[in-house]
């Protein structure tokens, strides 16, 4: 059994801070769950173009408001508490925080914890990081 406290994990290298967001990775690849699980904060006013070419992601909004734009269709979906979106086709998107948003995120394959977004907004595969 794995038990982790978010407030404790935030004080470790599981917390990653970047421009427009921060994320605490509560489950990582080494936990052998088949996915990683993160609590991510999107800062108010952030506009984050992303394209997870190597990962699928599901995101549930806990608090805050914003939007996600599907760059293939131009469709914009509102995000608010209780809304989930799933990037099931490696969707190119822009995430915008109208207010600070707290999100619960699951990634498959799981991240290792060392990833940073590349110039296209993607996380590389672990093999590409070696």
From Swiss-Prot:
| GO biological process annotation, one example | ectoine biosynthetic process
Q: Enumerate the catalysed reactions.
A: (2S)-4-acetamido-2-aminobutanoate = L-ectoine + H2O
Where does the UniProt annotation place the signal sequence?
none
Q: Which InterPro entries match?
A: Ectoine_synth, RmlC-like_jellyroll, RmlC_Cupin_sf
Q: Which UniProt keywords apply?
A: Lyase
Q: What EC class does the entry list? A: lyase
Q: Which GO terms describe its molecular function?
A: ectoine synthase activity
Q: Which HAMAP family match?
A: Ectoine_synth (MF_01255)
State what this protein does. Answer: Catalyzes the circularization of gamma-N-acetyl-alpha,gamma-diaminobutyric acid (ADABA) to ectoine (1,4,5,6-tetrahydro-2-methyl-4-pyrimidine carboxylic acid), which is an excellent osmoprotectant.
**Family note:** Belongs to the ectoine synthase family.
What is the name of the protein in this document? L-ectoine synthase
Which organism's genome codes for this protein? Phenylobacterium zucineum (strain HLK1)
């Amino acid at each position: 059994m794995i038990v982790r406290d978010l407030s404790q994990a935030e004080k470790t290298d599981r917390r990653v801070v970047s421009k427009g967001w921060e994320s605490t990775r509560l489950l990582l690849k080494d936990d052998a769950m088949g996915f990683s699980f993160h609590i991510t904060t999107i800062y108010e006013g952030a506009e984050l173009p992303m394209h997870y070419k190597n990962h699928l992601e599901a995101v549930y909004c806990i608090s805050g408001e914003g939007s996600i734009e599907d760059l293939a269709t131009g469709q914009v979906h509102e995000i608010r508490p209780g809304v989930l979106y799933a990037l099931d086709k490696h969707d190119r998107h822009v995430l915008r925080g109208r207010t600070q948003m707290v999100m619960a995120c699951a990634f498959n394959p799981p991240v290792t914890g060392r990833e940073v977004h590349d110039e296209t907004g993607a996380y590389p595969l672990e093999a590409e990081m070696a």
